[in-house]
Amino acid sequence: MVANNGTADALVAALKRKGGIQMTVLPLYNVMLIPETNLYLQTQAFTAMTGKEPENQDRLIIAAEKSPKKREEITEDDLYPIGVSGIITEINSDNNYIVIRTKKRADITDITIFADHTINVTATKREDTPGEDIDPDDERARLDKLKQALVGYFSNSQWGSASRGYIAQFGSISEIAAAMSPWLFNSAEDRYKVLEEDSKAKRLDLMEKMIYENIEMSNIGTEAANAQEADYQKIYRESALKKQID
């Protein structure tokens, strides 16, 4: 639904009467949205997609875009029906990036796009599969194995020794998937399939499989792997920054 400015004012008033909470809607493309991880974003990218400057402790609904579109081009059909809630925990003015701590998955309905291209949605917490436990020892073993695979992947690069320290900082497979998300070969639809999976165990399986497949695809040709090296350097630099911030 598209609303004019008068409708927007009326909607805000209605939300206040109902005790609703205004949250900034942030549409993102080519980012795997994962609960309970840190998401790094350039400040100008946040402003471009929300029409506002970031504020510390801003509460967000992050919506996954089906295709890359500018804020002015987005319609309600361009957003997937599941996103994640989040909060801005850090604004780094020196390096022009922000840190968003993602929270819970959310069902997104009642999408309204105003004349100024800001977006309002109804967001409802989406529950995970109840009664599901993940063996922490198994999860740790799988994380360690994946880290070793990443170390091996970068071992022949010019910064192979330095990458060990960055890789060691990851505390979960989710963190690795979130950091590598922009450089994975997978489509927006593939990334969304991880988010829409209600089982935490199956989400872990999907993320793990996706990362291994991308390592294998990158290893097929040395030329292709080298072409991506600069991008992966950026990933691990941001990971190092994350640990300094935390």
Regions found by a protein language model. Name each.
Residues 2-246:
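N-terminal low-complexity, acidic/polar interaction/targeting segments
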